[in-house]
């Protein structure tokens, strides 16, 4: 089983941390990296905007940010460490309301999306085929999450 560290630094949304950890482990298991180490940070819009501005030069809140440890200078330093996923609970709640979905559904989807980025999937900088591949993998894994946790 992997090492999953979850820190909930926001107060606006109720988060079932134990369930979120189980969802994260399911994602790691289904991605064939059950022993990987993952850090998950749940924040509000103010904090994610600061992170987005400071690290990605985008001065606005966003739903999820991923920082992979197996990229750039850090490759090979900690082979089991996937990286960090940061989710804005405020944006997730807003997006869930707009889509008429439960908050947990959006939260689990964003966790999955972030982990797939850590595993090298890319829908932004890659080709259309890369985006389709990521979307297909998301659909496949999220169907399993829905079945088990929602």
Curated annotation (Swiss-Prot):
InterPro entries assigned: MetalPrtase_cat_dom_sf_prd, YbeY, YbeY_CS
Pfam families, alphabetized: YbeY
Domain of life: Bacteria
This protein's GO CC annotations: cytoplasm
Molecular function GO labels: metalloendopeptidase activity; RNA endonuclease activity; zinc ion binding
E.C. numbers: 3.1.-.-
UniProt entry tagged with the keyword Metal-binding: yes
Chief place where the protein resides: cytoplasm
Cofactor mode of binding and number, as noted: Binds 1 zinc ion.
The keyword Cell wall biogenesis/degradation appears for this protein: no
Key words of the record: Cytoplasm, Endonuclease, Hydrolase, Metal-binding, Nuclease, Ribosome biogenesis, rRNA processing, Zinc
Entry's localization field: Cytoplasm
A biological process from GO: rRNA processing
Cofactor needs: Zn(2+)
Signal peptide positions (record): none
Annotated positions binding Zn(2+): 113, 117, 123
PANTHER family: ENDORIBONUCLEASE YBEY, CHLOROPLASTIC (PTHR46986:SF1)
Protein family per UniProt: Belongs to the endoribonuclease YbeY family.
Biological role stated in the UniProt entry: Single strand-specific metallo-endoribonuclease involved in late-stage 70S ribosome quality control and in maturation of the 3' terminus of the 16S rRNA.
Protein name per Swiss-Prot or TrEMBL: Endoribonuclease YbeY
Lineage: Bacteria, Pseudomonadati, Thermodesulfobacteriota, Desulfuromonadia, Desulfuromonadales
Protein's gene: ybeY
